Amino acid sequence: MWNPRGQRVVVTGASSGIGAATAVEFARLGAVVGLVARRRQQLGEVLEACRETSPDSQIFVADLSDLEAIDGLVTTIIATLGQIDVLINNAGVPKRRKTSAVTVADAESVMRINYLSPVALSLAVLPTMRRRDAGHIVNISSMGAHMVSFGVGAYSATKAALEYFTEAMYVELAGTGVHAHVVVPGTTLSEFSTAKDGNDPPFRSDPKLAATPEVVAAAIVASLSDDRFITYATERDGATAASRNADPNAFLFSMRDRLAGLGR
């Protein structure tokens, strides 16, 4: 069983939603948390909650779309916290737009944050983890990588890319003390799923079927005690993915029939 007490855990996208809940949960369990996001005020509010149980936790304000600055960010975090034992790549942005309306600029911008940024962060922390022969990289994916919903093709593609990169790390790091895996949330009750500029309105879903950020945070913590590559945030998400993987064509036929007419 992995023990979080005293571990240095870095959480990106920690100013709200899953990231904030994850940071607070690790702090509650005794980890020293490094909170990374762009929004200083919101980060400060989450830091206050973390410091109630983890007084040495710190914030690092950063724009993760600036890939050239990521090595420097990691150097600063290590200098402040001492080392990084666990990296939770949670930061992400939505892109809700039909494929026929997506621009190359749309695709590039969402790929930069959702895929290239966690790749760059993973590559930046790997050398020190390999030297210590210890560490965890947890990349937060999405059910969108397993069942593309209407109007989120560009977003889903970024999460599928992240899963395959992480899968390669998982295999290549076998036999070392460094581990990489993904956690897959479905629809979550957070601002990520609300209306945003530059996006079509969120697809309507039953809020009773959505997970809370705290449920996802608990799944992230639990995944560190498991050797599996993929952890679904809820049993329902896992069952949906299993159904899709059992017969992708039948699953997509059913989805296409249910959504027929929305694309007109």
Identify the residue ranges that each predicted region occupies.
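Substrate-binding pocket helix/loop in short-chain dehydrogenase/reductase
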Residues: 98-99, 103-108
